[in-house]
Structure formats: C-alpha cells, structure tokens
A protein has these predicted regions:
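Extracytoplasmic/periplasmic solute-binding protein
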Residues: 1-46, 61, 90
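Glycine-centered hinge/linker elements that transmit conformational signals in sensory
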Residues: 42-73
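Short, hydrophobic alpha-helical packing/hinge segments within bilobed ligand-binding/sensory domains
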Residues: 1, 81-85, 99, 146, ...
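Paired acidic/hydrophobic, glycine-rich loop segments that form the ligand-binding mouth/hinge
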Residues: 12, 91-96, 112
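Beta->alpha turn/N-cap motifs
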Residues: 14, 78, 95-100, 130-132
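Extracytoplasmic/periplasmic substrate-recognition and gating elements
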Residues: 66, 104-168, 215, 224
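Conserved C-terminal helix/tail region of periplasmic/extracytoplasmic solute-binding proteins
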Residues: 5, 194-245
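Short helix-initiation/N-cap motifs at beta->coil->alpha
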Residues: 71-86
Length: 245
C-alpha cells in the first residue's frame, strides 16, 4: 500500500508465457499448505479441488484484486517488465537469479532479494530452486566413460568454474564459496535454511499437467472470480492425466 500510494507498482510479472505465474502458485501453495502437500499435488496424489488449494488461490486473488501487480501482465514476456524496475516505476519481481543477467552492470548494485514472505510460521519452508543436471543415455555405447565425464562435470573444480562464470549456485558442497559475491552467499544461506527444495511447477509435475495448470493460472490472473471453476477443471484434468500414468 505504501508503494502504491507513492505511485510505484509493487510487483511486476510477465505472464505472456505462463511459467512466471506458476511461480506464484508454487510459493503461495507451499507457504499456505506446506511443501509436502504441494509436492503431493504435483505428483497427482492430492486433488486440485481440495479446500487447501482454494485457500492458496484466495491469497493470490487478494494480491491481484488489490492491484499489487502490474496491469496487463499477460501482454508482457518476463524480460519486458524489467524496464519498469529500472525506471523505478515498480519495486519487486518474483524471478530467479538469472534475471540479473538482463540488468545492466551499472544498475546491479541497486537490486537485492529476500525470501518469499512467510504466511504461516507453523508451516515448513519450501523454496523453488530449479537444478540443472547432466545425464547420460541408458544405452550409451561407452557407459563407464560417460560416468567418468559426469563425475568430472560434478567435480569441485568444474562446479567452481561454472559458479564463477555463470554466476549460478553450485550443487557440489565442497566448492569454496568464500570469494563468491554476497548475493550468491545470501542465496545459499536461504536455501540452507529451507525445509524442502522444489524444482518448479513444470518440473515437479508431468508435462501434461504442467500445460493444463499454467493455462489455468493465466486464466485466473485475468479473472479471479473463477477460482471454483478453474480448480474443478484442473481436478478433472488431474484425474485423467494421472489415471493414464
């Protein structure tokens, strides 16, 4: 409300491609209902028409209905909304660390990040931290060499190089992080303090359910009065998709 009263849009999001909206569902569902329920929903063992899911959507609707998001979010891709922040017309963005790659060097010092706000202190903390991995084909002609190469890619030395060059958090716990930028150290502390690390909506559920879910999130963003209809439709899709698994 303070930001709005000063002519600043509190939150930007570009939902032209649906995945930025999915991040909002991930976090609100984990903050309201806990990461265990969220992941079970992703795995198809909980139902979308469960009152707990509706409760998460109601928190989301409150943010949208109060005008805390940028107007016409569906007309923007995720990078299109960055100028609003650079011009100090907007304040916050739920986005991954990679967003800093699109911020001019001279502006990077102006930006910081914080944990998605806790809604219920009694609920375990879940965080979205999509992890990129390396894989070898099951029928690789040289499986032992492939395993050795994968071990090399996951080694302390290579993980250090990747972290320094790409500015991404390493997965190898032996990497010396003492010389890392403060933002990276802060990110690692944030994840270390989490009770569960999720991978993101479209990675944690099936591709078919992810497609239906993200389309539903876009529809909800445009009309928050349709929660019951949207969740009923998602539940029908969940039942069909996971019955076929």
């Amino acid at each position: 409300e303070t930001l709005k009263s000063n002519g600043v849009t509190p939150i930007v999001s570009g939902t032209k491609n649906a995945w930025p909206a999915a991040a909002w569902f991930d976090y609100l569902n984990m903050r309201v209902n806990g990461p265990e329920f969220h992941i079970n929903l992703m795995l198809g063992t909980e139902k979308y028409d469960d009152p707990r899911v509706k409760k998460a959507f109601e928190y989301w609707a409150e943010l949208l209905d109060n005008g805390y998001f940028i107007e016409n979010a569906a007309s923007y891709d995720w990078q299109d909304v960055l100028p609003f922040m650079l011009q100090e017309k907007a304040a916050m963005y739920l986005m991954g660390q990679f967003v800093m790659d699109s911020i001019p060097e001279e502006n990077k010092a102006d930006y910081d990040f914080f944990r998605f706000p806790i809604i219920d202190p009694a609920v375990p903390i879940g965080e979205d931290a999509p992890t990129d991995g390396y894989f070898a084909a099951a029928n690789a002609p040289h499986p032992e060499a492939a395993k050795q190469f994968l071990a090399f890619l996951g080694s302390k030395e290579v993980q250090t190089y990747v972290a320094e060059e790409l500015k991404r958090l390493p997965t190898n716990t032996e990497v010396d992080t003492s010389s890392f930028p403060e933002a990276s150290k802060k990110g690692m502390e944030l994840l270390a303090g989490a009770d569960y690390i999720a991978q993101f909506f479209d990675r944690d559920t099936t591709p078919e359910m992810a497609e239906k879910g993200m389309a539903a999130f876009q529809a909800f963003w445009n009309d928050t009065t349709q929660i019951d209809t949207i969740l009923a439709d998602l539940e029908k899709e969940r039942a069909l998709i996971f019955a076929a698994e």
